[in-house]
Amino acid sequence: KNVILMIGDGMSLMHMYSAWTANRGKLWLDNSQYTGLSKTYCANRLITDSGAGGTALATGHKTNYHMVGVDPEGKPLESLTTLANKKGLSSGIAVTCRLWDATPADFCCHNTDRDAEAEIVADYVNCGVDYVFGGGSKLFENRADGRDLFKELREKGYQTPRSWEELAKIQKGKVFCVTDTVDTPLPAERGDLLARASMKAIDLLGQNPEGFFLMVEGSQLDDYGHFNDIDLLMQETHDFDRTIGRIFEWAAQDGETLVVVTADHETGGLTLVDGDLNEGRIVCKFSTGGHSGVMVPVYAFGPGAENFTGIFENTDIFWKIKKLLNL
């Protein structure tokens, strides 16, 4: 009935195992029932980015590096959020980055260049997604083209809270929450905002008896992989894992929800070279400040989880979810 796709941006098996070690052998992710491996290469490069990598997950098509929600020729592709809405299901996204960043845009927008930020943000007005939570308010208002996208969203029937406190009060209806709190660079300052925003999405989207599709992204794992900052990377990874835990617990009680956890690519070429499990100590090395081409893990929990075993293309995740939701 429901599918929640959780994307750890830049997350690899090594990220999760390092986090497991740092947490003295405990992760919520350990409760996954089935696991697989996903090939992340894109249409024109072995090493992908979040534009092409996320587009594969969102639409089932490999596209060119830096493209968002379009095929290699630039033709717009339908995403899982769009297909869910067409079938009468609700849809949503919750991320800890600016909404013009590639992964959220892959599910809602269409552009041949992920850096065309103002154009990408304008696409959200007509995307039809029922719940959006993320950051990046500056491109929704005070734009060079004079448009007030918050006003346009309200005219489309959205409520537009600008903080968690405002969002928490909403009990029903379509929501487009842009709060710059998600852009706080330090995970400790952001707190459990991703978990709260995700559970709020479930509360609102779950009111639809037909079901829902929700994408949740731990966005800033990627940032600290690029920065080769293992301490903040582990903080982000543990924040994402705690969000996974909240969602796994809810899904276990619900009984009709599949949760799939994966990544769009790996960032940093992370290697765990030493450590101590009892002390929660890790010694890691990075091989790059960019992305690497390794396969990324896929974890699944709930009804239909058995479909996510083995080695498969990243695009297969889309097709498996589409089939399970009968989209």
What are these regions (language model features)?
Residues 5, 132, 177-179, 213-217, ...:
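Structural motif
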Residues 57-65, 174-187, 222-227, 299-303:
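Gly-rich Lys/Arg/Thr-decorated short loops/hinges at beta-loop-alpha junctions or inter-strand turns
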Residues 232-250, 279-292:
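Gly/Ser/Thr-rich active-site loops/lids in small-molecule metabolic enzymes
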